[in-house]
């Protein structure tokens, strides 16, 4: 499984198909939301291909949200990351055997998060209607200055729905 480029391509392909089928049903998010989400997730690809030299605010926001809400579900990440420390875990991370698999999972799951959070509407205390994705800062925290207190119950409900979608 480690360093398996074809496995990562297969994982991304099947993930894309599964995400597209989910969007076609329109139950949780639309095809338009998913297309936009893949466009945004593309900024993460540029960051990874340049070894973090090219970093956009969008890529930072997506990664921060994924990390802060513990969204990325990948068995190799869960098993491997906690046991490896030091230089290999940080500076030489791109050489890890499961790197390609983890990146494929990220590119499958990040668009689902973005699409679902964009499709979940929220009305601020001021009466402004927005979506949950736009309510987060690039640090992956709720923007209280612009949108008021975080709708914690709605965010948690959406996270649970997201976890179920990812695990399908």
Summary of predicted features, one role per range:
Residues 1-168:
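Hydrophobic, often aromatic-rich secondary-structure segments at membrane interfaces
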């Amino acid at each position: 499984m480690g360093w398996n480029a074809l496995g990562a391509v297969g994982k991304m392909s099947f993930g894309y198909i599964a995400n597209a089928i989910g969007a076609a049903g329109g139950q949780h998010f639309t095809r338009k939301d998913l297309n936009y989400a893949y466009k945004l997730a593309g900024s993460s690809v540029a960051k990874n291909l340049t070894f973090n030299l090219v970093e956009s605010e969008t890529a930072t926001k997506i990664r921060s949200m994924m990390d802060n809400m513990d969204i990325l579900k990948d068995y190799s990440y869960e098993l491997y990351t906690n046991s490896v420390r030091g230089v290999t875990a940080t500076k030489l991370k791109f050489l890890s055997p499961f790197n390609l698999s983890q990146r494929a999972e990220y590119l499958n799951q990040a668009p689902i998060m973005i699409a679902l959070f964009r499709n979940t509407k929220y009305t601020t205390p001021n009466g402004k209607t927005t979506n949950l994705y736009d309510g987060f800062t690039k640090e992956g925290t709720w923007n209280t200055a612009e949108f008021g207190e975080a709708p914690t119950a709605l965010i948690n409900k959406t996270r649970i729905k997201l976890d179920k979608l990812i695990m399908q």
